[in-house]
């Protein structure tokens, strides 16, 4: 027994938090995305990793995008967590625009949440999918 006693309930989309960045934090975040920083979560001693964002070449300029949605896929067997992974959803990313730039106008990506980040708050969301597996805890 792992001590995990969760209930297997899927979460379609839920708000995790909302953050407003200072100008210094904004620049640090931009640099972290440009330098391919990643996060690590650990659930029941199972590590999960993912990038905090990505850069995309648009009109000859690389623009940093912050991943603002995380999807967790959790597999269980009985009351034991067997596998845990996390992925990002590119449809729910936020472009980090330079607040001093004239380029802070809406872009062509209708599905992308756009923010100047130092002027607006950025909402972070998550979803969870639970699946049953026959893999025993001893083989996780």
Question: What name fits each language-model region?
Answer:
Residues 1-140:
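Soluble extramembrane domains flanking the early transmembrane region of eukaryotic membrane proteins
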């Amino acid at each position: 027994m792992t001590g995990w006693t969760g209930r297997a309930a899927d979460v379609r989309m839920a708000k995790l938090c909302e953050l407003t960045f200072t100008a210094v934090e904004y620049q640090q975040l931009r640099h972290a995305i440009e330098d391919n920083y990643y996060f690590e979560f650990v659930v029941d001693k199972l590590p999960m990793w993912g990038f905090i964002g990505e850069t995309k070449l648009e009109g000859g300029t690389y623009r940093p995008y912050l991943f603002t949605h995380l999807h967790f896929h959790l597999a269980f067997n009985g009351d034991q967590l067997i596998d845990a992974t996390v992925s990002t959803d590119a449809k729910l990313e936020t472009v980090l625009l330079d607040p001093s730039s004239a380029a802070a106008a809406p872009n062509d990506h209708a599905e992308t949440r756009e923010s100047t980040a130092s002027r607006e708050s950025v909402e972070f969301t998550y979803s969870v999918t639970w699946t049953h597996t026959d893999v025993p805890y001893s083989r996780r």
